[in-house]
Amino acid sequence: MDKNKLIGLILISILLIVYTHFFDNKLPKTSQQTTTQEVAHNTSNIQLQTSEATLNLQTGIFAKATQGVTKDIILENKDIRVTLSSHGAKVKEVILKQYKDYLGKPLKLLDEQSTNMGFQFTSNQASINTNTLFFNTDDTDQYIQQASIGKVTFMIPLGEPNQYLQQVYTLPSEGYALTQNWEFVGTENYIDQGKIDFVWHDFIKRAEKDVQACRNKTTINYYLANKTFKHLKEHTEQKEEQTIQTPIQWLAIKQRFFTAGIFTDQPFESGNILLKPTTQPDKFVKEAYTTVSLASNNLQPIQKGTFRFYFGPNTYKDLNSFAQGFSKNLPLGWPIVKWINLYLIIPIFSFIEKYVSNYGLVILILVIFIKLLLLPLSYKSYISMAEMKVLKPTLDALKAKYGNDMQSVQMEQVKLYREMGINPLSGCIPVLLQMPILLAMFNFFPNAIDLRQKAFLWAPDLSTYDAIINLPFQIPFYGSHVSLFTLLMTASTILYTWSSNQVNTPQGPMKTMSYLLPITFMFILNSFPAGLSFYYFVSNLFTFAQQALIKRFVNEDKIKAKLAKNKEKSANNKEGSFKKRFQDAIKASASHKGKK
C-alpha cells in the first residue's frame, strides 16, 4: 500500500469516527420527534374535521352559529328594563321599574331561569331553535331619553351575502311595548316544508304574597284574527291544553296584576297552548307553554315580520293602547258592569288618586261621590220606606184580622196600596238600579293594581285580605284567617237589615233570608281584597248617615196627609178596568182556594 492510500484510509476512518460520535445520536431523535408532531397534528386535523362534519350534519348552514360568546345588552326607559342576549337574540330578563314584588325587590316579570323563547324549525331533518344560536351585535346598553327610540340589532351571516338571520329590537322612551322586527333572508331552501314556529315557555314567577289568589287569576288568553277573544280556565288545579286551528292575532300569559303577551302583524296560522300547575309552588305560579306557527305561502316560509311584546301591568290605559282587544286581559265584568267600570268607576278613581295619596281616603271619597250620584234614587227609596212606615199599623191590623190566610192578606194589601196611591215596587226599583254599581265594585277592586301594596289602618295591602287573626286550621268556605274589614262590613249590613225590617216587616223565609245573606257574603268576602270590604263597610255607614239626613227633611205628617188625600180621591173615582180585573182575579183566586 503506498503512502497516499494509507493517509486516505486514515482520514476516512477519522471522519467516520467523528461523524458517528457527533451526529449519529442526534439525527434519529430529531426524526422521531418530527414524526410524533406530524402524527399529533394529523390526528388533531382529523378530529376537527370530524367535529365540523358532525356539526354540519346537525345544523347545516347554521353550524358556525352554534358556537360563540354571549353578550347581554340592556334597553331601558322610565318604565321597563329589558335585557337582551346575543345567545338566541332573545329577551333574557324584564324588570318593571315602577313595581316591587312581595319581598320588596324589583319586580322581575321574566328572567333567564323562568322563560325561554325563540324561532324553531327543521333544516335537513335537524331541529333548529334560534335561542341556541349565537348572534353578532355591535350595540351597547341604552337608556332611552324622552322622544327617542332605543335600537339593538342581532345578526347571523350564513355564508352568502344574501343569506342571514336578523332580529332588531326597538323600545320607546316610555311604556311597556317592545318591538321585534325579524328577517330570515335566503333561507327558504334550508327550512323543511317552509314551517317556522315561535316557541315561548314561561315558568310564571311569583310576585304576590297571596299566591293562591294570583294563581286563581292566571291563565293564557288569546285573540283570533276574526276578533274573537278566548282563554283557558283560570280557577283550576288541572292541566289545561288547547289546540288552535284558527289564525291568531295575539296571545298573552295573564296574571292577576301583570301580563306578558305577543302581538304579530301577520296572524299566526295555528297554535298550541298549555297551562299546568308548577312543581315549585313557592317560586312560581303556573307553567305556560305556547307554540304558534308563522304564516307560510305554498310551503315557502315568510322571510320577515314584526312582533310586539307587552311586558307590563294590567291597567286599562296601557292594555287598550297596545293592541285591539288586548284590554280584555283586564276582566271588568259583564257588559253593563264593564261599562260602569270603564266610564264611571275607573275615571272617578283615577281622578281622585291624582290628588290623594292615601288609598283608604281615595276609597272613602269614592263612596261619597257614588252616594251623591245615587242620591235621587236613595231619596225615592226612603220616601217609599216612610210611606210603608205610615201604613205599618194598618198592615199589621190586616195580618191580625186574616191570620194565616195569606191570599186574603195580599188581596187586602193590594186594595190598600191602590187606595193610598202607593206603588209597593217604588222602594225596590231604586235599590235594583244601584245593583250594577255594587257588582261593578265587585269586579273593580280585585283587579285594581293601584291598590297593590297600598296600606291603610291595620291592612298592609288593600289588594288582598286584612288578616287580623291567622287560624291554625281551615274553616270550609271561609279560610284560615279572619278579615276585620269583612267582619265590620257584615255587622253593618246586619244592622242595616234590622233597621229596614222595622219598617217593611218581612215574614217567614224572606226575613230569614235577609239576615242569612250578609252571613253568606262574610264567607265569600273573607279572602277578597280588603279594599272591597272597606268600600262596602263605608258605604253602609254613609247609607245610615244619608237616611238620617233625609229624615230631617221629610215630614211624616205631610206623608200621612198625602196618603189620606189619595185615599179620598180614590174613593171618588171609578176603578179603572185594569185595576178592576186585577182585583177580580185576586178574589177569584181566593174563592177557588176556599172551595178546595
From Swiss-Prot:
Query: What residues form the membrane-spanning segments?
Result: 4-24, 332-352, 359-379, 425-445, 468-488, 518-538
**What are the entry keywords?**
Cell inner membrane, Cell membrane, Chaperone, Membrane, Protein transport, Transmembrane, Transmembrane helix, Transport
| CDD domains the record matches | 5TM_YidC_Alb3 (cd20070), EcYidC-like_peri (cd19961)
Q: Which Pfam families match?
A: 60KD_IMP, YidC_periplas
Please state where this protein is localized: Cell inner membrane
The main place the protein resides is membrane
Write out the GO MF terms.
Answer: membrane insertase activity
Function, please?
Required for the insertion and/or proper folding and/or complex formation of integral membrane proteins into the membrane. Involved in integration of membrane proteins that insert both dependently and independently of the Sec translocase complex, as well as at least some lipoproteins. Aids folding of multispanning membrane proteins.
What HAMAP family does the database record attribute to this sequence?
YidC_type1 (MF_01810)
Family stated for the protein in its record: Belongs to the OXA1/ALB3/YidC family. Type 1 subfamily.
Assembly and partners are described as:
Interacts with the Sec translocase complex via SecD. Specifically interacts with transmembrane segments of nascent integral membrane proteins during membrane integration.
Question: What is this protein's record name?
Answer: Membrane protein insertase YidC
Which species expresses this protein natively? Amoebophilus asiaticus (strain 5a2)
Instruction: Give the gene that encodes this protein.
Output: yidC
